[in-house]
């Protein structure tokens, strides 16, 4: 941009500003966002409140805009093309007004801290500072040209005053200076803020909160125990702070040789002088499976209390009903067994009576046949038992044994119940073994262990489990670096007593 401020140069200025804003809003699309064309607020501090009233007056009770088709919308690029940002028409403030309006709308649309939220906030800061610089540059150029013209006129008239009066300012100069004052009075850099939480040992602070100055929403605290602190800027940057080097004596620059040395921490370097890692939010890394998936700090009832309430209200009732069913089933089984035993005893008594009345010779022949048949069956069973494949014996492991209860539970679709019962039983056996001070697990414990392992393996293979993303809680600030210790204190050396000669 050249330093002349003629009509053609102002047009070039608008074209250049439009190209810069288009390049800056490639990712956030601020210059292409639509907004009401008829809305305009002269006071830059009341743009947000006036826009809320403007929308509320045109909305119904449900919050929907009445006659939305008739609402005329425009964009910043369209206004650039229509020439509505001419400096002679107060274009600097109009452009700042539209940029602030669109950025405010987008800031309240995106959640706090997101990438788009930060991009819109950066665009607002960049464009506001760009307009302030250009206002100042063009205003200075106008002042210089008008000053030259006024000097030449005053020299011709015989007045040799070199001062630049307000009467010499043109209408364009006044409009630009007025727009500059309005923008500079409204645009402010927000104070940085951080989260603070007080723990048992020390206070922990988070990184700087990325909240925009345009955001009128309340702070979304990650926890009710957190507080917000303002990070005040350092004003005395030019004055170097004194370091903990030497502590000079108060009486003289030359220390007294009889006193102990006043040198303290000569080689001390403060940790803040290094680029050390600061407090960051919790990142679990390889321990994601152990990380909590939800935060119970803001809840009235935690998971332990909910479990106790469930156990008292529902769990004990379920156990009571199950125990009643078991007792009834055992009673039915006992009654059935007693009836069967009575029938068998009656039949045996009848058979004994019939055999005693029969012929004894037939009984002798039958006994011989029975002994022969039993001997043959025993020989075949022994042959079948001794036929074992060595390959199967070599590949056999304790986990290969499958019980009938496992097959039945898989058929009924209740393997989780069998796993729970087995784990409870395993826990009880382990507790008894530890109380008896027995280190080696029993055979029953080993069988239960392999049983649970086998069932879980079958369930995982059947379900084809894949990795599922888990959202872990990160609302816990962690202090990465902590420096313990204290400043060493100079100890006074005891003076030696001089021996006086008698």
Swiss-Prot record:
UniProt xrefs under InterPro entries: Bromodomain, Bromodomain-like_sf, Engrailed_Homeobox_TFs
Pfam hit, one: Bromodomain
Record field: compositional bias (Basic and acidic residues): 339-353
The keyword Mitochondrion appears for this protein: no
Principal location class: nucleus
Region feature (Disordered): 336-378
One GO process term, biological-process aspect: nucleosome disassembly
GO CC, any one term: chromatin
This protein's UniProt keywords: Bromodomain, Chromatin regulator, Nucleus, Transcription, Transcription regulation
Compartments (UniProt record): Nucleus
Domain of life the protein comes from: Eukaryota
Bromo domain residues: 19-134
Quaternary organization: Component of the two forms of the RSC complex composed of at least either RSC1 or RSC2, and ARP7, ARP9, LDB7, NPL6, RSC3, RSC30, RSC4, RSC58, RSC6, RSC8, RSC9, SFH1, STH1, HTL1 and probably RTT102. The complexes interact with histone and histone variant components of centromeric chromatin.
Miscellaneous remark of the record: Present with 4460 molecules/cell in log phase SD medium.
Function as written in the Swiss-Prot or TrEMBL entry: Component of the chromatin structure-remodeling complex (RSC), which is involved in transcription regulation and nucleosome positioning. RSC is responsible for the transfer of a histone octamer from a nucleosome core particle to naked DNA. The reaction requires ATP and involves an activated RSC-nucleosome intermediate. Remodeling reaction also involves DNA translocation, DNA twist and conformational change.
Protein's UniProt name: Chromatin structure-remodeling complex protein RSC58
Organism of this sequence: Saccharomyces cerevisiae (strain ATCC 204508 / S288c)
């Amino acid at each position: 941009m050249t330093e002349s401020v003629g009509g053609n140069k102002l047009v070039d200025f608008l074209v250049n500003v439009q190209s810069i804003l288009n390049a800056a809003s490639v990712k956030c699309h601020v210059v292409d966002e639509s907004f009401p064309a008829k809305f305009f607020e002269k006071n830059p501090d009341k743009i947000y409140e006036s826009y809320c009233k403007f929308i509320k007056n045109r909305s119904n009770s449900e919050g929907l805009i009445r006659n939305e088709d008739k609402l005329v919308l425009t964009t910043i690029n369209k206004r650039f093309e229509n020439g509505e940002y001419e400096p002679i028409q107060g274009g600097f403030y109009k452009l700042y007004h539209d940029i602030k309006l669109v950025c405010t709308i987008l800031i309240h649309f995106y959640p706090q801290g997101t990438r788009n939220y930060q991009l819109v906030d950066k665009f607002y800061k960049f464009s506001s500072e760009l307009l302030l610089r250009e206002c100042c540059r063009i205003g200075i150029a106008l002042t210089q040209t008008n000053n030259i013209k006024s000097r030449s006129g005053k020299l011709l008239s015989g007045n040799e005053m070199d001062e630049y009066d307000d009467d010499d300012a043109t209408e364009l100069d006044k409009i630009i200076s007025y727009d500059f004052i309005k923008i500079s009075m409204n645009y402010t850099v927000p104070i940085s803020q951080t989260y603070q939480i007080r723990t048992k040992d020390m206070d922990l602070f988070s990184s700087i909160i990325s909240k925009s100055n345009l955001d009128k929403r309340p702070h979304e605290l990650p926890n009710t125990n957190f507080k917000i602190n303002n990070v005040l800027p350092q004003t005395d940057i030019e004055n170097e702070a004194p370091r903990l080097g030497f502590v000079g004596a108060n009486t003289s620059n030359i220390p007294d040789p009889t006193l102990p040395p006043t040198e303290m921490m000569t080689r001390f370097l403060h940790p803040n002088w290094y680029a050390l890692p600061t407090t960051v939010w919790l990142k679990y890394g390889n321990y994601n499976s152990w990380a909590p998936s939800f935060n119970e700090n803001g809840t009235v009832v935690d998971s332990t209390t909910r479990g106790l309430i469930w156990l008292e209200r529902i769990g004990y009732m379920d156990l009571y009903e199950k125990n009643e069913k078991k007792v009834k089933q055992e009673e039915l089984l006992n009654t059935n067994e007693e009836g069967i035993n009575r029938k068998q005893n009656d039949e045996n008594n009848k058979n004994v009576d019939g055999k005693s009345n029969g012929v004894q010779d037939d009984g002798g022949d039958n006994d011989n046949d029975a002994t022969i048949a039993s001997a043959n069956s025993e020989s075949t069973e022994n042959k079948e038992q001794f036929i074992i494949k060595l390959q199967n014996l070599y590949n056999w492991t304790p986990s290969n044994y499958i019980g009938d209860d496992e097959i039945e539970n898989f058929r009924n679709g209740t393997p989780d119940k069998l796993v729970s019962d087995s784990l409870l039983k395993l826990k009880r056996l382990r507790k008894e073994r530890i109380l008896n001070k027995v280190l080696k697990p029993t055979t029953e414990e080993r069988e239960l262990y392999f049983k649970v392992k086998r069932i879980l393996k079958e369930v995982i293979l059947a379900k084809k489990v894949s990795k599922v993303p888990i959202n872990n809680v990160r609302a816990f600030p962690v202090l990465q670096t902590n420096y313990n210790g204290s400043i060493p204190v100079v100890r006074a050396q005891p003076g030696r007593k001089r021996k006086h000669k008698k």
